[in-house]
């Protein structure tokens, strides 16, 4: 009995649910091509701003024993660079599954302008609005301000008619899950992506008695194994609170087939990999696909839908 990882997401069919997390291995067209030619089921572009950004000073990304700390500051080549890439790829590979396109403006107005550009283009993929970057000095995470989140989405959906998801920060309180889900349920969202890195962690080099990343006096977003329990909780919380039409993408701490299975069991439809992709490169997708299939076959599952979201309580 062979397990199939075929994943239906919105109106698209992907060979498996795995993709990169925006920010990892997607800065240049070369990296995007490597993702497109890998075993990943889908891929997403680097979060784009209006103009090219260099991001924060280095060192700004460090691998640590159980994950990573980063304070990248949204370095990217600007929206025109990525839009040109995806439009060319659509034209050259018309039968390929839909591409994900990420945007992350520095203000509501910039986000609206970025989304207008996508709305007015021939892009026929899926857009992800990043409401949760924790690493831009002086710019708070929009999605921790519930009123601002609602205002942003009201303005977005006044004109944006293409499939749109939002990338969320981690939440830690049931009241916050409830409030955010109530807001999100008011809009025709395609999905939520939980979670972005846990913001403003601190990692210390004891030998040097110093922080390890330069920006923000060493404070940075934490990813990898450290964040998996929080990621699973957010996936589960939103899966059980959102309208069934709003899918959940699970991101955080996925480095094995077991991790992937747990995210799917909590209700995730697609899975994004960040820290471990940074460490292993695109070959991770082949490994993790095999590991997930092995788990499913050992349990007698032939498709992900047989267990997705069916987490047992005790």
UniProtKB/Swiss-Prot annotation:
pH dependence comment: Optimum pH is 8.5. Active from pH 7 to pH 10.
Pathway the protein acts in: Pyrimidine metabolism; UMP biosynthesis via de novo pathway
Keyword terms: Cytoplasm, Flavoprotein, FMN, Isopeptide bond, Oxidoreductase, Pyrimidine biosynthesis, Ubl conjugation
UniProt binding sites for FMN: 46-47, 130, 167, 195, 224, 252-253, 274-275
Top EC class for this record: oxidoreductase
Activity regulation behaviour: The activity is independent of the presence of oxygen.
Active-site residues per Swiss-Prot or TrEMBL entry: 133 (nucleophile)
InterPro entries named among the record's database cross-references: Aldolase_TIM (IPR013785), DHO_dehydrogenase (IPR050074), DHOD_1A (IPR033886), Dihydro_DH_chainA_dom2 (IPR023359), Dihydroorotate_DH_1 (IPR024920), Dihydroorotate_DH_1_2 (IPR012135), Dihydroorotate_DH_cat (IPR005720), Dihydroorotate_DH_CS (IPR001295)
Subunit structure of this chain's protein: Homodimer.
Function: Catalyzes the conversion of dihydroorotate to orotate with fumarate as the electron acceptor. Molecular oxygen can replace fumarate in vitro. Does not use oxaloacetate or NAD or NADP as electron acceptors.
Name of protein: Dihydroorotate dehydrogenase (fumarate)
